[in-house]
Each structure stands twice: as C-alpha cells, then as structure tokens.
Design a protein with these regions (language model features):
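Acetyl-CoA-dependent GNAT
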Residues: 4-72, 95, 99, 127-128, ...
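Residue-level recognition of the GNAT/N-acetyltransferase active site
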Residues: 6, 76, 80, 109
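Charged catalytic carboxylate motif
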Residues: 9-12, 87-88, 114
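Conserved acetyl-CoA-binding loop-helix of GNAT-fold acetyltransferases
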Residues: 75, 81-94, 121
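Conserved GNAT acetyl-CoA-binding A-motif
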Residues: 96-108
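Conserved beta-strand-loop-alpha-helix junction that forms the acyl-donor binding cleft
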Residues: 106-115, 134
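Conserved acetyl-CoA-binding loop of GNAT-fold acetyltransferases
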Residues: 120-129
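Short, charged, solvent-exposed linker or helix-capping segments at domain edges/interfaces
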Residues: 142-147
Length: 147
C-alpha cells in the first residue's frame, strides 16, 4: 500500500534510510525536526510504501510552486523489483499534478548504479545540458553516508 507520509512515520522511515548502503543522511535536514518542517511545507506529496504493517519504501517529495523535487527515494532491498518504487513515484507525481506542478526533478549520485538504472527504466531523462550548483548555508548540516 502506498500512502502519504506523516511525521508519525519518521522513526520507521529513518530506520529504513539507515539500512540502505550509500544513503546520505544530513544531520539537520534529515532529523525529526527537519523532516517535520519539510512535511509541514509539503503535506500531501511525500509517500511511504507499507507491507504487512512495515514501511518498506519512502519518498520525500516537495515543490516550490513551480517545480517538484524528489528526495530520499528508497525501497528496502528485500522488497525491490516488485514495482514498489515505481508505484511510489507515480503516487508522488499524482500529488504534484494535483497541486498544478508540471515538472519534477531529482538528484542521484553518479555512483548510485541501482538508482540511476531505475530512473532510466521508468522513463526519466538524464540532463546533460546543465551543471548542478549548491552553496552551504549551515556547516553543521553534515552528510554521513551509510556503509
């Protein structure tokens, strides 16, 4: 079952993130407070996948009024290759469409072979015509990668 994510899901979603090799978790943005702030700003667009009462997948999804963005798209390794990821993406995009968002993007690490193959398989286009820039406003927001 795919449903909207709520802050009550945080502990289970965070535990899922911690299980995934190579997953980058930010100390502030991905804290309970950070995710709660994100969900308050985007109350309808983030989703979880639930199997037998257990959260096995999640997407943080939001928008700025113009473009949507997917973050932390993941499915527990034991549940992959069953359409869960695709179904979560479809649900998140339906919610974006309902809010009149016409385009959605995401960032995937270049070394994330599984993720990059997934996005190609479900019809997403890899952009080759732009550069991605960022500027850190809070140095305390450290990213740690799971091993």
């Amino acid at each position: 079952m795919i449903r909207r994510m709520t802050i009550e899901d945080y502990d289970d979603v965070h535990a899922l993130w911690m299980k995934i090799k190579g997953f980058g978790i930010r100390s502030i943005d991905d804290s309970r407070e950070g995710v709660e702030r994100f969900l308050k700003r985007n109350p309808t667009t983030s989703v979880v996948a639930v199997e037998d009462g257990t959260i096995v997948g999640s997407i943080l999804c939001g928008h700025d009024g113009r473009r949507g963005c997917l973050y932390h798209v993941c499915v527990d390794e034991a549940y992959r290759m069953h359409g869960i990821g695709r179904n979560m993406v479809v649900k998140a995009m339906e919610e974006l469409k309902a809010e009149h968002i016409n385009k959605v993007s995401l960032i995937a690490f270049t070394k994330n072979d599984i993720g990059n193959a997934f996005w190609k398989e479900i019809g997403w286009t890899k952009r080759e015509d732009l550069n991605y820039y960022e500027f850190t406003l809070n140095e305390a927001n450290i990213t740690a990668f799971n091993r």
